[in-house]
Structure formats: structure tokens, C-alpha cells
């Protein structure tokens, strides 16, 4: 039995084919994930298999019928099998790679979760914004059902009724409108599934993700060190792991401030974090008549008191060169 069962109800089953690819395909192959796709028109009646009707009270567009969606969600809650998606291609290389699936242990529900009811997710622009915290919570689920709306959406009574059999969540992936819910399903399914233990071969991969600590992830680099005249930051090849981690933290903080400054307001920042945000590299040359080592020592203390971190001071004759990082220039 898979660790997570996804059922998707849609009028465009072929839209869900990407769930068979890459890591999700491997998760299906290894039995970590199973996906069933249900064609909503299987529950429609009449010659035209219509699933929509004009909105009550008038207005543009069409609304999806409750008498079609209701029975569909009833049957899926009872375990009706859909068209099962298998992996897009068998993975015959026995050598584990960074993105291969590993053995998976069951994960318990969080306190307060009612595991007797599956989770029903309804992608809609009117829903609560989907976050990384949602993805983390839902990765512990055993059964998630997606209801893909189209047109002007699904009759609201469908969700009121579905609460008898599901834990219903209306969710939005952004402040924009799509043609239907299928794209949102792909986004949410991938964000959730990749957090299931074993789906990512490197167990630390998702721990460093953007939003995992409330911040955006900083830039990444790989070989070669110099490409088209552009050099990767020297600290990344220094071999000093502490400096590398400090650099990554600083880049994460600065990118978040530039792109999503509101996230910083929601994140606990340490004294070091605040220094990283405000600091800049400083190089200052000072002429001192009769400079001595005592002067250098006094200057070093003064610089540290002024907020410099690890200042380097060189004395050449009567000239002092100060290099370091500080929130305030010398």
C-alpha cells in the first residue's frame, strides 16, 4: 500500500500526465505514491454529459453542477478506483542518485487531525493561500482528493455537503486566475509529495528550501568556477564550511529583503542576521603621523566597538589600511 494516495476529479484527465514524470514517477514506481484520475463526466447524465449550468441570479459564465460533483465525491470517498497513473518510464539504473527514492517509514498525523476522513483540496482563487507550511502538513496525509473546477467554479453546496465525508480546504496558489484547477493540482501535488520521506534522495534537500525557515533560498552555483567571464563567489571554494554557511545565510536574508520584504517581518532575526542585512565591505586608508603597534591595537578595539567584524589592519609607514565589514563606514 502506498504512503500517499492522490485522487483527482477533473473533466480533463490527460492534464494530469505530468504526475507520472521524474521524481513523482519514481515515487509511483517505488510504491510511495499512488495516483487515481477520475473523469467527472462519468457521473454526468444525458446525451451531452453536461457538467455545468448557468449561474442562479444571472451573470457571465457557467457553474459546475452539484448533482454531478456530489455523487463523484461520494464515490471517491468510498474508495472508487480511478484510472491509475503509472511511472512514465521504468528506472533501471540501480545506482542511487541524488534524486532517487529511498525506503520510506510511515509518518503520523499531527495532533488534532481526523485521519478517518480524507483531505479534499479545492483549488480556487478565492481560497486560502497555499504555503510551504501547508505542504509540510499535507505530506503526512494518507489520502488527498483534488476537485478541479472549471468555468465560474463549482456550486458551493458541493463543499458544504462534502464536509460530511472530507476535511475540506479551499486553497489558492496565487493572486491570479487560471482556466481550471488542474495546473494548481500539479503544483500542490509536487510541493507535497517531495516532502514525503524517501522521495528526495538527499534528506537535507527540502530542509534548505525557500520558505522552510521563513526566508527565500539564496543563489546556487556549480562547476566551472569561472563561466563566460563570470566567477562564482570565492567563499564557496574556500573549504571553510562555517564561512560558506554564513555566506548562504546572508544571501538568503538579502534576497528575501529585496524580493519579499514582508517575510522578514514574520521571521525571528538574530543579531548576526541583522548585521548581515546592514553590513557592507569597507576598505579605508588612514594616514597617522608616527603610527605604532600600540595605535593599531587601540584602533582595532575602537573598530570592534564601532561594529566592525574581524577588521584587518595593515601598517605601512604612517599609513593604516583598514579592511572589514561594518554597518557603518569608518
For the regions a protein language model found, what residue spans apply to each?
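Structured adenosyl-cofactor binding patch, chiefly the S-adenosyl-L-methionine
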Residues: 154, 158-209
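Short linear proline/tyrosine/threonine-rich motifs used for host-factor recruitment
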Residues: 320-322
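SAM-dependent methyltransferases
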Residues: 2-4, 224-305
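S-adenosyl-L-methionine/SAH cofactor-binding core of RNA-modifying enzymes
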Residues: 65-84, 95-101, 108-150, 197
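Glycine-rich, flexible N-terminal cofactor/catalytic loop recognition
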Residues: 2-42
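Short, structured active-site "lid" loops
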Residues: 51-72
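Internal, active-site/partner-interface "lid" segment
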Residues: 183, 195-235
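Short, surface-exposed acidic-centric catalytic microdomains
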Residues: 37-58
Amino acid at each position: 500500500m502506498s504512503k500517499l494516495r492522490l485522487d483527482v476529479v477533473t473533466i480533463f484527465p490527460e492534464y494530469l500526465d505530468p504526475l507520472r514524470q521524474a521524481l513523482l514517477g519514481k515515487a509511483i514506481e517505488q510504491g510511495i505514491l499512488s495516483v487515481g484520475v477520475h473523469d467527472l463526466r462519468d457521473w454526468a447524465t444525458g446525451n451531452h454529459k453536461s457538467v455545468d449550468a448557468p449561474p442562479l441570479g444571472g451573470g457571465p459564465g457557467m457553474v459546475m453542477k452539484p448533482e454531478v460533483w456530489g455523487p463523484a465525491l461520494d464515490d471517491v470517498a468510498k474508495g472508487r478506483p480511478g484510472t491509475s497513473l503509472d511511472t512514465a518510464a521504468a528506472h533501471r539504473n540501480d545506482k542511487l542518485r541524488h534524486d532517487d527514492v529511498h525506503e520510506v517509514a510511515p509518518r503520523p498525523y499531527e495532533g488534532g487531525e481526523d485521519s478517518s476522513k480524507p483531505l479534499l483540496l479545492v483549488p480556487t482563487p478565492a481560497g486560502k493561500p497555499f504555503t510551504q507550511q501547508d505542504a509540510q502538513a499535507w505530506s503526512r496525509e494518507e489520502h488527498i482528493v483534488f476537485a478541479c473546477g472549471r468555468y465560474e467554479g463549482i456550486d458551493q453546496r458541493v463543499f458544504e455537503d462534502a464536509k460530511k465525508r472530507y476535511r475540506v480546504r479551499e486553497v489558492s496558489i496565487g493572486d491570479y486566475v487560471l482556466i481550471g484547477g488542474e495546473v494548481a493540482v500539479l503544483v500542490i501535488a509536487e510541493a507535497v509529495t517531495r516532502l514525503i520521506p524517501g522521495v528526495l534522495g538527499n534528506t537535507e534537500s527540502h530542509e534548505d528550501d525557500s520558505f522552510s525557515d521563513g526566508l527565500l533560498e539564496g543563489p546556487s552555483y556549480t562547476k566551472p568556477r569561472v563561466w563566460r567571464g563570470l566567477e562564482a563567489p570565492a567563499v564557496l571554494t574556500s573549504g571553510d564550511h562555517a564561512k560558506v554557511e554564513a555566506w548562504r545565510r546572508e544571501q538568503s536574508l538579502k534576497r528575501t529583503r529585496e524580493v519579499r520584504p514582508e517575510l522578514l517581518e514574520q521571521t525571528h532575526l538574530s543579531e548576526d542576521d541583522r548585521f548581515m542585512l546592514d553590513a557592507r565591505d569597507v576598505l579605508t586608508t588612514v594616514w597617522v603621523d608616527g603610527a605604532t603597534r600600540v595605535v593599531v591595537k587601540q584602533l582595532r578595539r575602537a573598530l570592534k566597538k564601532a561594529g566592525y567584524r574581524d577588521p584587518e589592519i595593515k601598517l605601512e609607514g604612517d599609513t593604516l589600511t583598514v579592511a572589514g565589514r561594518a554597518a557603518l563606514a569608518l
